[in-house]
Amino acid sequence: MKALKIHGAGHMTTEQVPVPEPGVGEVRVRMQYGGICGSDLHYFFEGRNGEFEVLEPFTPGHEMSGVVDLDPSGRLAAGTPVAIAPATYGTPEAGIEDRRHLWPGGTYFGSASTRPHTQGGMQEYRVVQDFMIRPLPEGLATDAAALAEPLAVALHALRMAGGVAGRTVLVTGCGPIGLCVAAACAAQGAARVDATDALEGPLDRARSVGAATTYRAGVDDVPATAYDTVFECSGAAPAVSQALRSVRRAGTVAQVGMLPDQPVGVNLAPFVSKEVTFTGCFRFDDEIDEAIELLAAHPEIARVITHVIPADRVQEAFDIARDSQQSGKVVVSLWLDS
């Protein structure tokens, strides 16, 4: 079978590897679609994602969907369309028993955080543990289902912020995660969703998924002390300062975008003087089930996907995904004609 392999910065190949055999408690999935995440971009273009360096060839991809190929238990028929929950969980820790995604020792598809690295899903077949399988509801196509994982990240952020129904919301940073956050807020009854970004392309896409008013960062004046909840999705220090400036007194800022693992210059004065609740948001726990339901109920969320590109043009796919002016979520189709 074919599999994409990242060897280091700028070096990715398509290789022939053996078709894996599922064991007890496992299912073999014919992978069909994989979304390109920011971590995939870091691994390919830089050879590392933060502190996690590519030290051996590994397959990227954790935003995955496909169809069941073989379930030895007989529970799932071949051809059943599914999305994949890409995490395994580590050892429970006191105080976070209800936050499995924070337990130490877990793994995540397509990650160099462990050695050996955890292989991802951008290959023709992938054996997964049966608890990772999420059958899709009727009418939800597997290409759109590649959004289940990033939408779950967005829904986890909404949960961490205490929900958005009836609230005014600002989203800073309209890359794929920011777009998923904006779409989720609109679908879940926010009174108003506004958005900021440094580029016009992402703002166009934000309006297409429910943003009412958009602001060019560094060009337009963004309202101050105006929003019940701000979701900071860029991971840029100036946007963190903007989020704290724009949130109302006693409001909530949810930090969704990953920040660099080093000191950054952020104006924290509003955090103190307005008694802002500032919460971090990391991956998700069980929100992927809600994400799948939301995708089925709100097909407009699939507008977050701007490109579907065959795996034989994967270099082009990664180049487009890196260009946030022209692309939202870029999805790779995995040799569907083979």
Residue ranges and their predicted role:
Residues 5-21, 38-65, 83-88, 103-117:
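N-terminal glycine-rich cofactor-binding segment
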Residues 1, 285-338:
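C-terminal hydrophobic helical "lid"/dimerization subdomain
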Residues 20-34, 48-96, 137-139:
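Glycine-rich beta-strand-centered segment in the early N-terminal region that forms part
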Residues 63, 80-81, 102, 125, ...:
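Residue-level marker of beta-strand positions
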Residues 252, 265-304:
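Rossmann-fold dehydrogenase core element
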Residues 79, 131, 137-219:
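Mid-domain Rossmann-like dinucleotide-binding core that forms the NAD(H)/NADP(H) cofactor-binding site
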Residues 198-199, 259, 284:
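Residues in the short beta-alpha loop(s) of Rossmann-like NAD(P)-binding domains
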